Design a protein with these regions (language model features):
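Nucleotidyltransferase catalytic core that binds NTPs
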Residues: 1-209
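Short beta-strand-centered aromatic/proline hotspots
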Residues: 213
Length: 213
């Protein structure tokens, strides 16, 4: 897998589940892009790696840190240079055809990325859903998460992270996204919760379990 994950979401988690299932007992790698800007890529490379490992602990050891890998082509070169002769890439359903065409175009050909030559070419498998890095309003996309962070809506932001990450780390992630977007950090995380005087949600809030996702 090669992804932006800026920020990571439960959609990325589903993609990684498919990756692990597809790999079976074979090794698999997760590469993250290193692009960073204050519009669509607010998180730094190091922050993405850190938070992805917290969000997806099952796959933490497979999340690779390699400053030389900045594109899918770089990732394939690194995998080929490690001795692998065959490779399967897992991607969102809307990216499968694009990856099949572009990545196989350079199979066996040298380029700026280096060289890779996999037997049977690069096989690209659909994760069964659209690319969680895609822009738009479909599903729990990274673009929606950036919007929640911009609005300071921690409730919806946290819902898009899943259950593995702690409340404290979820808050740090939202503030890291805000900072990368050029916004001030926020401490008023619970302003979006409207509680009735007596309710189960109020008791969860008081006991500190409401945001234990």
């Amino acid at each position: 897998v090669f992804g932006r994950m800026n920020p990571p979401t439960i959609g990325h988690g589903r993609l990684l589940d498919v990756l692990a299932k597809q790999a079976g007992r074979n090794n698999y790698r997760i590469y993250l892009s290193q692009s960073q800007n204050n519009k669509k890529d607010p998180l730094s490379y190091s922050d993405k790696v850190k938070f992805c490992r917290k969000m997806f602990p099952r796959y933490a050891r497979s999340i690779i840190i390699d400053n030389k890998v900045k594109t899918p082509f770089d990732a394939l070169t690194a995998i080929y240079n490690s001795g692998c002769k065959k490779v399967v890439m897992v991607a969102g359903s809307d990216r499968v055809d694009e990856y099949k065409t572009r990545l196989n175009l350079y199979n066996g050909k040298k380029g700026k990325h280096g060289f890779y030559n996999f037997e049977d070419g690069i096989k690209v498998v659909s994760a069964g859903a659209r690319d969680p890095d895609a822009e738009g309003v479909e599903g729990m996309s990274a673009s929606k998460m950036r919007k929640y962070a911009t609005d300071g809506d921690f409730t919806k932001f946290a819902q898009g992270l899943g259950k593995s990450i702690s409340t404290a780390d979820a808050r740090k992630l939202m503030n890291a996204v805000r900072s990368g977007l050029g916004l001030r950090e926020t401490t008023s995380f619970q302003n979006h919760i409207q509680l009735s005087p007596v309710s189960e949600r109020r008791e969860q809030f008081v006991s500190g379990t409401l945001f234990e996702l």
